[in-house]
Amino acid sequence: MQATAVVLKQGEYRPSEDEPFMSERQLEYFKQKLLDWKEDILRESRETVTHLQLETENHPDLADRASSETDRALELRTRDRQRKLISKIDDALRRIEEGAYGFCEETGEPIGLARLEARPIATLSVEAQERHERRERVHRDD
């Protein structure tokens, strides 16, 4: 059987189940996807910092000040989530370099292209993730 990849617009590549799992081409695809995602987050973060610096003015109106503080708190929470996401992206990039990317940390089985396409930082297969979430619910209910 000959492996074929899905090729989209002019040179745009998309991994296919017909290829060997985590081939060099697939790894390069996911590496670039992760790097692009990280750059988008960093750009948004820089824009947030700039916006926060511009919004340091005092608002004489109490309602305006409260609204501004609420916006600032929301932006800071978003920035914290972005920082955590960058850490997960860096972990995924490290797994690519180590040859562990795309394989479930719990079972060692392939995570699957569809899941990685949707969530490139995934470390668990769908089944392992569901087991993990069930265990969390059981312990949370205790």
Predicted regions and their residues:
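Short cysteine-rich clusters marking metal-coordination/redox-active sites
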Residues: 104-107, 125
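Short functional micro-motifs and their immediate structural scaffolds
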Residues: 111-112, 133
